[in-house]
Amino acid sequence: MLRTSPAGSLRAEHTAQVVTLTGWVDRRRDHGGVAFIDLRDASGIAQVVIRDEAVAHPLRNEFVLQVTGEVSRRPAGNENPNLPTGEIEVVASDVVVLNSAAALPFQVSTALADTEAIGEEVRLKYRYLDLRRPAPARAIRLRAKANQAARRVLDAEEFVEIETPTLTRSTPEGARDFLVPARLAPGSWYALPQSPQLFKQLLMVAGMERYYQIARCYRDEDFRADRQPEFTQLDVEMSFVEQDDVIALAEKVLVALWELIGFTIPTPIPRMTFDDAMRLYGTDKPDLRFGNPIVELTSYFADTPFRVFQSEYVGAVVMAGGASLPRRQFDAWQEWAKQRGARGLAYVTFPEDGSDLGGPVAKNLSDAERAGLREATGAAPGDAVFFAAGATTPSRALLGAARQEIAKRTGLIDSADQEGAWAFVWVVDAPLFKPTGDAADDGDVALGHSAWTAVHHAFTSPTPEWIDTFEQDPGSALSNAYDIVCNGNEIGGGSIRIHRRDVQERVFQVMGIDAAEAQEKFGFLLDAFSYGAPPHGGIAFGWDRILALLTGSESIREVIAFPKSGGGYDPLTQAPAPITAEQRRESGVDAVPDDETAPQA
C-alpha cells in the first residue's frame, strides 16, 4: 500500500506516530512561510503542515499527494471541532506529488463544494470530479450500504441471489425495448430486459423457491422528468406464498433500509385499497404525511342550480387560511390548473368574521348550499375551498394535485416532526385491467389489441374472487397486487402471479392476444406453466427512488454513479453516438431477415 493510515482515521492517540497518507489537496492555506494542506481521501481529511516553502509552492487543489510525517497535537486554540481529526496535524517530512491537476471546472473542496451552484450538465460531464464532493460521494456510499442491508435481510431468509440474462428476446412489457443487433444472426435482434419478470417466474418453476437480484433494467421511454433509460430494482420472488407473506418480507427489507438513516418504520405498514386512495387523495400514490383528504360533494350538489356542478363528479379540497390570499394568487391557481389540462379551479372563501361566502362560485349556489357548505367540507372561518367537477378520474386527479400543492405552500409537509417525516402505505386491490387509451395517456405501450390492457403487467393474478370470472367484467376485476408508497412516491410494486396456463391464456384473450400470438411471444412461459408451476409472487423495489429518498436527493440522478441527463444523453461519454459504416455492416443493422427462417419478434 502507498499509505499506512487513512487520513480520516487519525486521532489524538496517534500523536508521535510516523504515518504515510495519500489523497487529494482539498485546500491550502499559507501562514508566514508555512503551508497548511487539508489532505482528503475517502475516509476524511487530515491537516498536513509543510514547512519547506519550495515543496509547498507548486501544490494546488486536487493534486494527488503521498505525505509522510509525524502526527502532532495542534497548538492550543487551533483545534477544529468540526473535523474528526481536528485535534491533530501531520508535520510532513516527505511529500511526493503522485499527480497534478488541471484547472477545475468547479470547486471540489469540501469547504466550498456544497455551497457553489453548479449546472447539472457540467456536473455530469465531469462526474468523476463531482463525486469527489461530499454530498454526491455520501449518496453513492449510502447506496452501497443499502445493497448490503438488503442482502443481509434476504440471505437471512434463505433467498438465492441469481443473475438473469440481459440479452433476451423482445417481449411486450409496457414500454419500448432497447434492441441489440445479433451479429451472428443478421436481421435478428436481442432486447435488453425491462425487468427480470419472466425469468424470475421461470426460476420459481425451476424450484428455486426464493430468488432475489439487484437488477439492471432498461426502458426506451419518451423523456420524462426524473426517469432514466437504465435503472435498478431490487427484484424478489417467492414460491408457495400469499400476498401477506410477500408484504411481510418486503417490510423487513424496508425497515433495514430506513435504519441506515436512523428511522424505525412502524410495522405492520397500514394498507389502503386503490379505490380509497383515488377517492380520498386523487392518486394511487397518496402522501400521508398530512391529512386534508378530498371531500366528495356529488350528492351534496345533486340538485344544484349551478350548471358547472351538474356533473358526474364534484369534489373539493380545503386550503387552511386560504381566505386571506390576494386575488392574484387565486388567479395563479387558475393558471396552475390549466397547466394540468383543466379549465380552471373553482373556489369559495370563508371569511374570518363569519360573513357570507366569497369567491366567484358563491353567487351561483343556492341559499341552502351556501349555508351548509362549511360543514360539508369541514372548512373553518378563514379557509378557502377549491372545487373540481366533471369526469370522476381527472377531477379527482386535479384535486389530489391541489392537495399536494396546498401542503407545500402552507408548510404542512415541512412542519412534520421526525416521527411524521416518513409515511408509508400499501395500496392494494388495484384494477386488473384498464382501458387501452389510459395506457397511452400515461406514456406506456399498451400490450395487446383489445380495448383492455394490464394495469401492472399481464402476469398479475386476479384476486381469488375474480379468478373464474374476470373476462365477464374486465373493468371491475381486481388484481392480487400491492404497491408500497412512501411520502407520495411509489417505491415498489408486486403481485401474486398467474401460475396456471389456462388463466394466463384467458388474461391474454381479454387483452386481444390470441392463442397463436401468445404462443409466439410467450410460448416459453406458457410451456413452463405446463410442468407443475408453483403458486408464486414477488415484488420489485425501485432502488434509485428509494436511495433518493434516503439521501434527501431531489433527483434519482444524484444516487446513480454515472446517470444520463434529459433524453437519455450522457454528457460524460457523449452517448448515444453514431457508429461507423464498418460497425453497421458487421452488426447487421441493415440486414433484412429471410421471412422463412428468421425468428419472429
UniProtKB/Swiss-Prot annotation:
Subunit structure, as described in the record: Homodimer.
Pfam families (UniProt xref): GAD, tRNA-synt_2, tRNA_anti-codon
Residues that, per the record, bind L-aspartate: 173, 219, 456, 497
GO cellular component, one term: cytoplasm
Name of the protein in question: Aspartate--tRNA(Asp/Asn) ligase
EC number: 6.1.1.23
Site note Important for tRNA non-discrimination, residues: 31, 77
GO BP annotations listed: aspartyl-tRNA aminoacylation
Gene Ontology molecular function terms on file: aspartate-tRNA ligase activity; aspartate-tRNA(Asn) ligase activity; ATP binding; nucleic acid binding
Gene3D superfamilies assigned: Bira Bifunctional Protein, Domain 2, GAD-like domain, Nucleic acid-binding proteins
Gene that encodes it: aspS
UniProt-annotated location(s): Cytoplasm
Cross-referenced HAMAP family: Asp_tRNA_synth_type1 (MF_00044)
CDD domains: AspRS_core, EcAspRS_like_N
Known role: Aspartyl-tRNA synthetase with relaxed tRNA specificity since it is able to aspartylate not only its cognate tRNA(Asp) but also tRNA(Asn). Reaction proceeds in two steps: L-aspartate is first activated by ATP to form Asp-AMP and then transferred to the acceptor end of tRNA(Asp/Asn).
Catalytic activity: tRNA(Asx) + L-aspartate + ATP = L-aspartyl-tRNA(Asx) + AMP + diphosphate
ATP-binding as UniProt keyword: yes
Compositionally biased region (Acidic residues): 592-601
Species of the source: Beutenbergia cavernae (strain ATCC BAA-8 / DSM 12333 / CCUG 43141 / JCM 11478 / NBRC 16432 / NCIMB 13614 / HKI 0122)
Keywords annotated in UniProt: Aminoacyl-tRNA synthetase, ATP-binding, Cytoplasm, Ligase, Nucleotide-binding, Protein biosynthesis
Major localization listed first in the record, in broad terms: cytoplasm
Region named Disordered: 566-601
InterPro entries: Aa-tRNA-synt_II, aa-tRNA-synth_II, aa-tRNA-synth_II/BPL/LPL, Asp-tRNA-ligase_1, Asp-tRNA-ligase_1_N, Asp/Asn-tRNA-synth_IIb, AspRS_core, GAD-like_sf
Matching PROSITE patterns: AA_TRNA_LIGASE_II
